[in-house]
Structures are given as structure tokens and as C-alpha cells.
Amino acid sequence: MIRYRIANTRFAHTPKGKAAMTILARAVSIAAASITVGSFGLLAGPALAQPAKLGCTSALTAQGTQTLHCPTAITIVAESGAKFELRDRNRDGHVDSVELSNKALLLEVPKKQGRTRFDVVTPQAIAAVRGTKWAVDAEGAKTSVFVVDGRVSVARPAGRGSVVLGAGDGVDVEPSGDLIVKRWPPARVTALMARLGQ
């Protein structure tokens, strides 16, 4: 918690002084709240982006999405306000996993000899791949995975069942129930891709 104190002067007890001190106190409160929110990484809205790391560069688009380009030819497009964290599981200095807690990501991971499996981890699912383009949407207690191109394996973190998706396939992963692969209707695909500026 950030504490602040405004000096007690004679000016502070006049009507103009009280108004000025009230404005100053509000400004300090807003600044303190901004610092506190920023330090916990609670980012949302089209103008705010997650910091790029692990050698990735970041750019905001006109649609409010954020595009990360990583040195290993991995591209990640994040929906405006998406909450995610890039990870380097094998500690080689390159991103090989993303933890997604809210909203959607579109990922393109080219197939490369010797590359470790790339994962997107949400509270409900792990989507693993070795060369494809796919989207993952974490919303509340459900994670949806859709494959644009290639193949993606989807499983629950606890290992209770898994499925493999091909191009045009999707699956909704909820806390219980079977993982059912479905061909997504064009309207659903279009709506998800629009959120990702595609």
C-alpha cells in the first residue's frame, strides 16, 4: 500500500486551499492506484499490452490486438485485454509455452526439426503442437481450441482424456464431460478470428 500525507498549512484551511488539497489528494490516489495495478500486471483494454520477453518483439494493431514476433519464428496474436505469460520451460532463452488465463490467442508455430513441443496452458486444458496455426480462448470455466492449419493435441492438465484436432476442428474443454472434437461452423470461426484481428 502506498501512503501519502499532505502537509497541514494555513492555506489548507481556506476554501481555495481545501479545494486545491482535495484535487491534489485525488491525483495522488489515482497515481498510486495506477502504480499498484501496474505492479500486479492487471492489464486490460486496447491501449495496454503485455510486456514482450524472451527475445520477442511486440506491436499493437489498429484492431487493438497485440502481435508478438519471437526469434524462433513463432508468432502470437493476443486479443485486446488477453492475460497471458510467455514461458521458457527448457531454459534455452526461447519461448516454448504460454500460460493463458483470459481471452484468446492465435499462435503460429512453424515445424522445426528438434524443436520441443510448444504448449498453451489454461486452467482447463493443455494444447500442444509441433508446427501449426491455432487459436486458444480461455473464458471463465471453459477453454476452446480451434485449429486453422496442422494438428494440435488437447488434454486436461490432470491428464483425464485427450483428443487430436486437425484443420477446421475445435473442442470446448470444461471441468467435466468428454472432450468432443467438432467441425466449427464458419460463423463461430469468423467471430473468433475477428476478435484476433484476422
Could you tell me what each predicted segment is?
Residues L42-A49:
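Sec/Tat signal peptide C-region and signal peptidase I cleavage site
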Residues T14-G38:
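Bacterial N-terminal signal peptides that target proteins for export
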